[in-house]
Design a protein with these regions (language model features):
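Active-site anion-handling motifs in enzyme catalytic cores
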Residues: 1-314
């Protein structure tokens, strides 16, 4: 039996990988799980042809993970519809819609969502969006279920005793231009934690994508100029790829006494581990805001959100 897993960018960073791993573990009798890579230029007919070429029996098509673009979502919906037409069971598990993928307008091909045997989403915002699209069934909210992974403590031996401040902050000129004028407010919100050793908790490979290592390093340097980060090898891309995993990141988060982030995965791991979180939301930073709202009843004591206006365009 074959299970086809449809994701947007399944291996781009630890956040997407954590969702894929959780989904694979959660599928009963999954058989052989194949992560499908769709040609962005393929037509609906060509997508149906892809389904026909996969060795039978294809028993299940699963839509999962964080989708960022409307095109990738509509392609995946078209592929899922072809799978259903070929007799496969359709499941939506831990789906998250962000940015363009979560736009108000109902996407092409959304009718297949009403054929899902299971309709389960990662967060409340995605559930609200699906409801706005007029689906016949109400989605179930799983509330970042990948946060419950068993931590891997392999990297903890390299950390010093005492309280540690964990940071994971999205990089980019616009982001830094927004938070840097508010550094005194951030330091005040941290209180004594501003003087603790700093552990980077970035989810992207250094130098790739949103590069939250650059953002993390910039904030750490503003808080404690000249102070080296803990586990400096994580700032090297090959070392990071070799050393880190979702389970190891969760262990690092759990070792912190406070986590500062605008990333949803470190925040969700912190909530699961009982570590307070200072969320930094630049303007409408949906990922951290959605995470806080979805897990509002579980936030550890001392957690809070600091809203930061977006810097004016240069």
């Amino acid at each position: 039996m074959t299970t086809l897993l449809l994701c947007d960018v399944p291996f781009r960073d630890l956040g997407h990988l954590a969702i894929v791993q959780h989904t694979q573990r959660s599928l009963p009798d999954a058989g052989r799980v194949t992560v499908v890579k769709l040609d962005p230029d393929a037509s609906p007919a060509e997508l149906a042809g892809m389904v026909a070429k996969i060795p039978p029996p294809v028993k299940r098509v699963v839509l999962s993970g964080a989708f960022l673009t409307r095109h990738a979502l509509e392609q995946s919906l078209a592929f899922a519809a072809a799978g259903v037409a070929a007799g496969a069971r359709f499941v939506v598990h831990n789906l998250s819609l962000d940015a363009e993928a979560g736009a108000t307008l109902r996407p092409d091909g959304a009718d297949v969502l009403d054929l899902a045997a299971v309709l389960a989403v990662r967060d409340h915002r995605t559930a609200t969006q699906l409801t706005c699209w007029g689906l016949a069934q109400q989605p179930r909210i799983l509330a970042y279920p990948e946060r419950h992974i068993t931590p891997d403590a392999a990297l903890l031996a390299g950390l010093p005793p005492g309280p540690i401040l964990g940071i994971a902050l999205r990089g980019g000129d616009e982001m830094e231009a927004s938070w840097r004028p508010r550094i005194d407010d951030i330091a005040a919100a941290l209180g004594p934690a501003a003087d603790w050793p700093i552990l980077p908790l970035h989810t992207c490979p250094p130098g790739v994508g949103e590069d939250d290592f650059v953002g993390t390093r910039a904030l750490a340097g503003a808080l404690r100029p000249g102070t080296p980060l803990l586990l400096p090898e994580l700032g090297d891309r090959p070392s990071w790829a070799r050393c880190i995993s979702p389970a190891r990141l969760k262990a690092l988060v759990g070792r912190c006494a406070l986590v500062v982030t605008n990333r949803d995965l470190p925040a969700a791991y912190a909530v699961a581990a009982g570590v307070p979180v200072l969320g930094l939301a630049v303007e409408l930073d949906r990922r951290i805001l959605t995470c806080f709202a979805t897990l509002a009843n579980e936030l550890p004591r001392g957690s809070r959100m600091l809203r930061i206006p977006l810097a004016p365009a240069a």
